[in-house]
A protein has these predicted regions:
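Glycine-rich phosphate-binding loops of nucleotide-dependent enzymes
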Residues: 1-261
């Protein structure tokens, strides 16, 4: 049984049909990509999956439980965490503090314990700091722990967003254009990181990505949206050769390259 299933998801904004009967499944141990031309509905699907939007139709099932109607923080606590297309860090907090903020969904200390600075609070604080430092190192930010997030390079900020998302200890990690604005070396480094995460830190990754060399080089499964509808699904090579995908991308003057190109 799939770890996550989206069944017939539809979403309208006034007269605009943003998503139309979209279904997909995400299995344990998989890196899957969600691709499509600009305006295809990819981020809308992420926003619907994470509770920012409620679908007009359809079901979202995670571990045999419906996520429809849950608030974003409850979905995070359930085990699904994400990054955003537009970076959303606390610029005047340090790298370490930003990662610690991401742990709020897993905190088990009561408000009185926090206010009274109890032993349990201090124990969780120490554990949290240790975990945050581990994630900082994992994402290549060692030595930048006390740097303000706003002082990081664009690529470093992307990595920090990933570290913060991992701090919630998700089973599924959703990444919205994680390599946007990166050069080929930076993108390759992130691809290596994503492969390391599977099985050790998360069970599955679903990413939105416009860098087709990343998509074709890392994905076990690729789902393609166009005008809010899913037009193709398969392994990278199947999708690259699908006439519907070729037509959708050629309509924008772009092409889906081979990962070796």
């Amino acid at each position: 049984m799939a770890l996550l299933e989206l069944r017939g998801i539809s979403k309208r904004f006034g007269g605009l049909q943003a998503l139309a009967n979209v279904s997909l499944a995400l299995d344990d141990g998989i890196i899957a990509s969600l691709i499509g031309p600009n305006g295809a509905g990819k981020t809308t699907l992420f926003n619907t999956l994470t509770g920012l939007y409620r679908p007009d139709e359809g079901e979202i099932i995670f571990r045999e439980r419906s996520l429809i109607g849950l608030k974003p923080e409850n979905i995070t606590a359930a085990g699904i965490s994400r990054t955003f297309q537009n970076i959303r860090l606390f610029s005047y907090m340090t790298v370490l503090e930003n990662v610690l903020v991401g742990m709020h969904a897993r905190l088990q200390t009561s408000l009185p314990a926090i206010l009274l600075r109890s032993k349990r609070f201090h124990a969780q604080e120490d554990q949290g700091r240790h975990r945050a430092l581990e994630l900082v190192e994992l994402t290549g930010l060692r030595g930048r722990e006390e740097t303000w997030a706003g002082q990081l390079s664009y690529g470093e900020q992307r990595r920090l967003e990933i570290a913060r998302a991992l701090a919630a200890e998700p089973e599924i990690l959703l990444l919205d254009e994680p390599t946007a604005g990166m050069n080929s070396q930076e993108a390759q480094s992130l691809m290596t990181l994503f492969k390391e995460l599977i099985g050790s830190y998360v069970k599955a990754i679903l990413l939105i990505e416009h860098n087709m060399r990343v998509v074709m080089g890392i994905s076990h499964r690729v789902h393609v949206l166009d005008y809010g509808e899913k037009i193709a699904e398969g392994d990278p090579e199947e999708v690259r050769r699908d006439p519907r995908v070729i037509e959708a991308y050629l309509g924008q003057g772009t092409w889906v390259p081979d990962a070796r190109d």
